[in-house]
């Protein structure tokens, strides 16, 4: 690292003429600075409370990738909005001008715990609390690693910058611009800190597959020795965080991981958990972080006099969040690494009540369901609508996948085959009927089924083939009511189940048409079947 990079984090070399550079400030300094500047307040227990204003979630429609010779054939343009190199040039010039003479906070951090595949990143912020946030979320170098630190990507986040759609080729005053050739991400016009976290994820999702490393939107746990690992894929609301938090196992991470020849590794060093209506009974470890010094609470309502938090109040945001280091969780991994997985779990919250509580997948079925990324959400009740809606988010994280999903799917299939991993589909949604008539799958049953899968005993169970989806469903499992293992038997109206199952199968088939041309015939053959019912049925 050059002398200038040691002094200013390499900003001058980027053409940034900052007034003051606060390089690698630690948590106490950033805490104090955020409060003194009026960016944040301290809650009872010591957490830092901040408000992000108009933006309380990601601005997905304001994210753009530079379309140039490097990215033209690498990026999945059906899913990623493009910006021209000329528009990005104008944006970069205006960002440089906006930073001139300003006080900036710079963190030199690693994305990834695998020493062979981690990414050194430079994160530039104008807000002290943003600098604290990303210091929690990424991995802080050891003291001796700073001397040789050379950032390979730069992320600059300036909430006070307002983009000009005509000049910058964007959609609004908010912009997230990614230039893979120049290795720069520019974030402007939003204070929502999750944009920085997900920018790092997007970068790694682009870079790692070229190295044969699989990036994943998932949680991971292992046994205390770092072996017998399990990957949990799942969209929001499927139970990914809850089910991977197991007191008898080590939590490697809750959101973003890679799978390399060395095993599994966390991209992050912290967690970014949903706080709304968080329960001390249901999730005690996460709830405890709300009363911890160091935690950054985003859009959590606090009494201005008593400084007591109200986690049930959604007046600032439904998407209230807490950022804290992984070390705040008692059974978290110190290294962020573990061995190769023994099991892959794909979680779905099926509000239609069709999916079994657990099913075993072949490698082809695993790739099919990974590319489908299915869950079902319950519609809002503001107009009295209670009909569930199907959600398909490919790779269980479509907004963060720059490459074509088939590229990630093929890599996952190869790794599953190489390491002989068992794959399971787990439904945490409804049984005995759809949402409104059925009941939520008992979490006790889900945990018992997961434990049987993870300890290997489920492999010796008797299975039946599901007539709609073709996967194998256990007939009996110790500690689980056998009736819930057959979803059709739990419905009082069997004809209604058959009709709904056919509709869901059709949704899968329609959704997968996007990927059919990009996958092998045996993966296409893993699709569900819309079957003709016999008179007996």
From Swiss-Prot:
Keyword Lyase attributed: yes
Cofactor, how bound (note): Binds 1 Mn(2+) ion per subunit.
Chain positions recorded as Mn(2+) binding sites: 198, 217, 255
Pathway(s) the chain acts in: Carbohydrate biosynthesis; gluconeogenesis
Residues given in the record as ATP binding sites: 198, 217, 234-242, 283, 321, 446
Cellular-component GO terms for this entry: cytosol
Stored Gene3D superfamilies: 3.90.228.20, Phosphoenolpyruvate Carboxykinase, domain 1, Phosphoenolpyruvate Carboxykinase, domain 2
Enzyme class: lyase
Cofactor: Mn(2+)
Catalytic activity: oxaloacetate + ATP = phosphoenolpyruvate + ADP + CO2
Keywords recorded for this protein, A-Z: ATP-binding, Cytoplasm, Decarboxylase, Gluconeogenesis, Lyase, Manganese, Metal-binding, Nucleotide-binding
Superkingdom classification of source: Bacteria
One matching Pfam family: PEPCK_ATP
Single biological process term from Gene Ontology: gluconeogenesis
Family, per entry: Belongs to the phosphoenolpyruvate carboxykinase (ATP) family.
Reported function: Involved in the gluconeogenesis. Catalyzes the conversion of oxaloacetate (OAA) to phosphoenolpyruvate (PEP) through direct phosphoryl transfer between the nucleoside triphosphate and OAA.
Database matches in NCBIfam families: pckA, PRK09344.1-2, PRK09344.1-3, PRK09344.1-4
Name of the protein this chain belongs to: Phosphoenolpyruvate carboxykinase (ATP)
Protein's organism: Maricaulis maris (strain MCS10)
